[in-house]
Amino acid sequence: MMERIRKEMILMERGLHSPTAGKRFSNLSNSAGNAVLEALENSQHPARLSPRLPSAPLHSALGELPAKGKFEIDTLFNLQHTGSESTVSSEISSAAESRKKPGHYSEAAAEADMSSDVEVGCSALRSPGGLGAAQLKENNGKGYAESGSAAGTTTSASGSGLGSLHGGSGGSGGSAALGGSGSGADQVRRYRTAFTREQIARLEKEFYRENYVSRPRRCELAAALNLPETTIKVWFQNRRMKDKRQRLAMSWPHPADPSFYTYMMTHAAATGSLPYPFHSHVPLHYYPHVGVTAAAAAAAASGAAAAASSPFATSIRPLDTFRALSHPYSRPELLCSFRHPGLYQAPAAAAGLNSAASAAAAAAAAAAAASSAAAAGAPPSGGSAPCSCLSCHSSQSAAAAAAAAAAALGSRGGGGGGGGGGGGGGGGAGAGGGSDFGCSAAAPRSESGFLPYSAAVLSKTAVSPPDQRDEAPLTR
């Protein structure tokens, strides 16, 4: 019974959808179709008659029609056996072989493929687009294998139709046609954005105002500069990384003392050497004690005489890191007044110092006296409490450790040792507790003696030749 229903369904589908079957059975009426069904049933089951149509009126009305119908059905379904099971298995095997072998097909093989499409049972596959794709494939000589394998879903069927229109074969061609636009978009080379001078100036100005811009501000800049918002976002990211690299590349004096680095950069920006104001992001009290020691002050004083003639002679060495203090620290009170304005008064000891060399020499003598007193265990000479600024940020352990280095450096300038001892007593009276430089906020200084560093020359320092180092007094 199931075989009969399947044959009826296949025959109805051929009458509705197959163009070849439509041509063959166009001259038959509904009764003729029923007669063909009856002939098919009688040929396979000769002992059983159809309950629907009697055999006598059928033969008297149609004459030779059953034999003709049986011939047509044999040619359609490739009937080679009388058993229905063998017929169905031969249909399935022929359909599978036709899927495996692409190439030119005969009419019978194409009809077998059509019957296999019917067995799939998806009504959406019989859309005009699917039939058009199949006809295009047959006309172009393409194989039906990929389209048959991709006919499980409507999407794959539409993909096969696109593939046949684009010259491909089957679902693979359709997927290539659909993915062609995406792959082409990915392969488009993205060139670098060429900013104009006005755009760069506006972006730099905005970066100096604020390193991180919000999205509404980025949108405003994009509208003002006629640039995409993502381009401005990427520019600010790159600019922040460039600024970070520049800060880290300045090996002096940032690793040793961030507070002094902040001081130098701020005053360089205030005088116009830097294009933007520098702001320290970490407070001074966050750092441990890495302040200027007595050895650094002695080294700074030794290079004070040659600072005017050759301010940036050679690159620094690890021991000569703070020799550059000689030039910008001709006014050491700027550091205290910069960090703690209004906390310090002018001592009388520093009132008569007017030049850069004499100021550095007196400061070095005071630092040497304070370090020697700290090394001997004596209390500091000053009476004021130490503050958290660079000049007052010192300890006895650092001073004791620096005394040996000061003695080693002082051996080069032994000729001026007597004068240094005399200056040490006067300079030590105005020094803070254990400090390298005195907190003199209002002492008169010459403006020409202070020259702040710029960002381009911060990696250089003053190193005096050996014959001029004995001009600055040093004490052991």
Curated annotation (Swiss-Prot):
Major subcellular location class: nucleus
Record carries keyword DNA-binding: yes
InterPro entries: Even-skipped_HD, HD, HD_metazoa, Homeobox_CS, Homeodomain-like_sf
Annotated spans, Disordered: 82-113, 142-185
Extent of Gly residues compositional bias: 160-183
Sample GO molecular function, one term: DNA-binding transcription factor activity, RNA polymerase II-specific
PANTHER family: HOMEOBOX EVEN-SKIPPED HOMOLOG PROTEIN 2 (PTHR46294:SF1), SEGMENTATION PROTEIN EVEN-SKIPPED (PTHR46294)
UniProt protein name: Homeobox even-skipped homolog protein 2
Organism: Homo sapiens
Source lineage: Eukaryota, Metazoa, Chordata, Craniata, Vertebrata
